């Protein structure tokens, strides 16, 4: 298929951020008496917004999930990301290749807040590829797994969502891309399992950004 545009998720696709974010989340849950490993935290929360998991969090901490707590989480998370964020291996070449193939019609469509996304992309030298074409699920009526952020990105690029390629790394994000009508390829950073990604609707799973190419 000749794709007219490529829409990227951010966390876990462009930047290696998910373990950093979940490390902060795990520490803050432990302060409230809910203990889990980093791996358990990632299994529960990667691909989801914290607010969307309110019922689960309150059931396990016994404490209301307040706006003040969320703000503290965002602040602590941002400090760690600014200090430790890195790009996914080989992603700069992949993004440049896809931008050239699609005549610059590439965008970021993230479930995360805009400040976080733009800060991370600047830190790793990817922001210029996407300047003016960064979309946040926090600014949409609904976030992933709903398709709103992908539909907004496609509309801005003036392309049919069905002619877009979406690059994702979680079942929740894949579901959003599929719901938008796009074809979804999933990046599975080893040792991530492939089956949940295929089950969610990914047409292809790849394990290295060096192989993300269009003919």
Predicted region positions:
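Asp-based, Mg2+/Mn2+-dependent phosphohydrolase catalytic module
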Residues: 1-4, 96, 113-215
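Conserved SAM-binding loop
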Residues: 14, 87, 106, 166-167, ...
């Amino acid at each position: 298929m000749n794709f007219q545009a490529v829409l990227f998720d951010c966390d876990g696709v462009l930047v290696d951020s998910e373990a950093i974010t979940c490390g902060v989340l795990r520490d803050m849950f432990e302060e409230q008496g809910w203990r889990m490993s980093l791996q358990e935290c990632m299994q529960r929360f990667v691909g989801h917004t914290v607010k969307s998991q309110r019922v689960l969090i309150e059931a396990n901490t016994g404490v209301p999930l307040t706006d003040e707590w969320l703000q503290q989480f965002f602040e602590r998370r941002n400090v760690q990301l600014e200090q430790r964020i890195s790009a996914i291996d080989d992603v700069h070449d992949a993004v440049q290749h896809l931008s050239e193939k699609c005549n610059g019609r590439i965008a970021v469509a993230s479930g995360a807040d805009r400040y976080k996304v733009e800060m991370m992309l600047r830190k790793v030298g990817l922001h210029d590829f996407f300047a003016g074409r960064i979309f946040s699920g926090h600014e949409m009526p609904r976030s992933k797994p709903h398709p709103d952020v992908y539909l907004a990105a496609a509309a801005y690029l003036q392309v049919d969502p069905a002619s877009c390629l979406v690059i994702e790394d979680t079942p929740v994000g894949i579901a959003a891309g599929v719901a938008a009508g796009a074809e979804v390829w999933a990046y599975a950073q080893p040792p991530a399992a492939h089956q949940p990604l295929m089950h969610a609707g990914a047409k292809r799973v790849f394990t290295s950004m060096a192989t993300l190419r269009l003919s």
